[in-house]
Regions:
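Acidic, PIN/NYN-like endoribonuclease modules and their adjacent C-terminal/linker elements
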Residues: 95, 99-126
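Short active-site oxyanion
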Residues: 29-32, 64-66, 100-104
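Acidic catalytic patch
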Residues: 41, 63-84
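A general structural signal for well-ordered alpha-helical segments in protein cores
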Residues: 19, 39, 55-58, 71, ...
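A generic structural signal for short hydrophobic patches within well-formed alpha-helices
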Residues: 9-10, 39, 75, 112-113
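Short, well-structured N-terminal submotif of metal-dependent ribonuclease cores
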Residues: 1-34, 46-57, 126
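Active-site phosphate/pyrophosphate-handling residues
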Residues: 7-8, 41, 73, 92-93
Length: 126
């Protein structure tokens, strides 16, 4: 299972050089984990930057993946991740979700660098 972080989603969606580098690491859609926090961040970014229609299309795509809602177990693990790794709340929820589901976290966000179960794809120049 792969949890694709919002940063990786955005790079992939805009077709950046970094997004192109991610393509080989993306599994079939059924093996993507999508926390509801990632859905929130994607909807917010897409609506602001691209438009509501594209946001609706991407959220529909995520719903074919394995959507993981925030529950008490993940919330408590996220609180610990905030403390232990000094992550912001949204990042901690995403990290804790990956850990709870024993998934690899695929990201372009350096906040996750060095954490267990994380594959960091460095941003490439345009």
């Amino acid at each position: 299972m792969i949890l694709v972080d919002t940063s990786a989603w955005i790079e992939w969606l805009i077709g950046s050089p970094t997004g192109d580098a991610l393509v080989d690491q993306l599994p079939e859609q059924a093996y993507w984990l999508v926390p509801t926090m990632v859905q929130l961040e994607l909807a917010k970014w897409l609506t602001r930057e691209i438009g509501e229609d594209k946001a609706d299309q991407v959220i529909a795509f995520t719903q074919v993946c394995q959507v993981v809602p925030l529950d008490t177990e993940i919330a408590l693990a996220a609180a610990e991740a905030c403390r232990a790794h000094r992550l912001a709340t949204a990042d901690a929820i995403i990290f804790a979700t990956a850990q709870a589901r024993r998934a690899t976290l695929l990201t372009c966000d350096r906040h996750f660098e060095g954490l267990p179960g994380v594959t960091l794809v460095e941003k490439r120049p345009a």
